């Protein structure tokens, strides 16, 4: 049989997964009740999921390849609702940080642990606790690149940022873009920029 410790661990993991799934359902309800319009689309073969803004219609597209990937990308759409993510005038996301990605991978793990534990990183994420900012930064894509690492293609911030973050927080989050931010006023935040689409 199972030891009481092993049994408690299994029950604990199930309870965490249930709480995560309930949180994902709550996010879906928020999106469904939002004044923001969302669309769903499947990725093509070999494409990554993502959340983008159609700048002609202001509809946010949640693009996904599997149900587990949908839970991940839908979490990012929920981050738009809370002001943790915004969009540029070209429809690309802004303010994504490693904590946003950590939350999305945890939500995905809650739905399908194997869809996350099978990913290549610095360690195997076989529990919620193993999905950390460092684990996210170590994730490798199909080409072996680390998109969430410092300077990676995903332009992922190092600290939590949102539409109210000041210039100094943005410099801390994106030090590779510090030169661009330094000329801005100290009380600057992303909401003061023309053409930025965020939840009002």
Language-model-detected regions and their locations in the chain:
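Metal-centered catalytic cores of metalloenzymes
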Residues: 20-27, 34
